[in-house]
Amino acid sequence: MIFNIGIDIVEVERFKNIKRFDSFLKRVFTQKELEYIRSKNFNMLTIAGYFAAKEAVAKALSTGIVFGFKDIEIQKDTNGCPKVKLYNRAKEICENLKITNIVLSISHQNSVAVACAIAEKEE
């Protein structure tokens, strides 16, 4: 059963203009995410897509952002599809709300990245 849906869209240009870019990356992304971003040569579409995904997941949990960005980790499954792994406060919130799965989709094109997250719980 669908608990909630979160959607986020970001302009890629916003990430090109970030001052202290390295600090931003370390503050927002987990070590595994940074490794993936590095493997993509710090592609701005990838960075924007992952950021939008984290925002969409937070919205799907309908709590506002009451946890750190690193509490949400975007991973890839064996087919290259995005999946979500939660830690710390975000994981606790899901357990309290009885959310069993978060389905995630990320898309981007030239100037924007968008993500949609669907939080599911058992009926």
From Swiss-Prot:
GO terms for biological process: fatty acid biosynthetic process; lysine biosynthetic process via aminoadipic acid. Its EC number is 2.7.8.7. Mg(2+) binds at D8, E55. One of its GO terms (cellular component) is cytosol. InterPro entries: 4-PPantetheinyl_Trfase_dom (IPR008278), 4-PPantetheinyl_Trfase_dom_sf (IPR037143), ACPS (IPR002582), P-Pant_transferase_sf (IPR050559), Ppantetheine-prot_Trfase_dom (IPR004568). Disulfide bonds: none annotated. It comes from the Bacteria. Keywords: Cytoplasm, Fatty acid biosynthesis, Fatty acid metabolism, Lipid biosynthesis, Lipid metabolism, Magnesium, Metal-binding, Transferase. One of its GO terms (molecular function) is magnesium ion binding. It is found in: Cytoplasm. It is an enzyme of class 2 (transferase). It catalyses: apo-[ACP] + CoA = holo-[ACP] + adenosine 3',5'-bisphosphate + H(+). Its cofactor is Mg(2+). Belongs to the P-Pant transferase superfamily. AcpS family. PANTHER family: L-AMINOADIPATE-SEMIALDEHYDE DEHYDROGENASE-PHOSPHOPANTETHEINYL TRANSFERASE (PTHR12215:SF10), PHOSPHOPANTETHEINE TRANSFERASE (PTHR12215). Transfers the 4'-phosphopantetheine moiety from coenzyme A to a Ser of acyl-carrier-protein. This is Holo-[acyl-carrier-protein] synthase. The lineage of its organism: Bacteria, Bacillati, Bacillota, Bacillota incertae sedis, Caldicellulosiruptorales.
